Amino acid sequence: MSRPAEIADAAISTLARDGMRGLTHRAVDRAAGLPEGSASYYFRTRQALLQATVERLAELDSTDMPPSTGMPPGTDMPPGTGIPPRTGLPAPPGQDLEAFTAAAARIVESWLTSGRERQLARYELALEATRRPELRQALVASGATIRAMVASQFAAAGVRQPGQRAADFVAFLDGLLFDQIAGAGTRKLTSAHLNAAIRALLAAVTGRG
């Protein structure tokens, strides 16, 4: 792992533990177990550190998704995004609904458990981005990549308006994640419930059961 990535990982941990107020260069140095001044050497400003953290979150998310091939581009992808080489999710209804559901459920479950820290950091960054347009831009770009991944799968399955349907699907999943991690609800979804919820969501969004 590179030193900048190590520092960004420490920033993620710091955000999840101490929130935005607790994110300082010195706090990140301590979290990374590095000499004081290390974080500021690579990321001179707070904005640079935040930007690196957003980019690292996107990189870690992409590693959760194993490569999938043979998926043609869709017809209404988010502007400015191509079809990433890593899609991770098999084709949805019309090709393999169960495989898509299982893969999506595995990813979401991992983000609720081993990846929970990342989600907490993401929520901190999302709130901060409402006051920092430059940070908002980085988060939007990261989200567009995920939506393009799903849209490519929907397009391959012949779903109409794959970009819009993918945006809806990802938005609903974001809501599910937030409810489980930071929402007021206390019910924790089992793997079976998670699979059922995603299956129902997929059918509703694509119009295919």
Q: Across the structure, where does each feature detected by a protein language model lie?
A:
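Hydrophobic/aromatic-rich alpha-helical bundle segments in the mid-to-C-terminal region
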Residues: 135-136, 140, 155-209
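Residues in soluble alpha-helical coiled-coils and helical-bundle/repeat scaffolds
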Residues: 44-48, 113, 130, 134, ...
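Hydrophobic alpha-helical connector segments
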Residues: 65-119, 166-169
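Amphipathic alpha-helical segments used for helix-helix packing
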Residues: 113-137
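Short, solvent-exposed amphipathic helices
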Residues: 138-145, 149
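Solvent-exposed, amphipathic alpha-helical segments
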Residues: 10-18, 64, 121, 125, ...
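Short, basic, alpha-helical segments at the C-terminal edge of helix-turn-helix-like DNA-binding modules
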Residues: 55-61
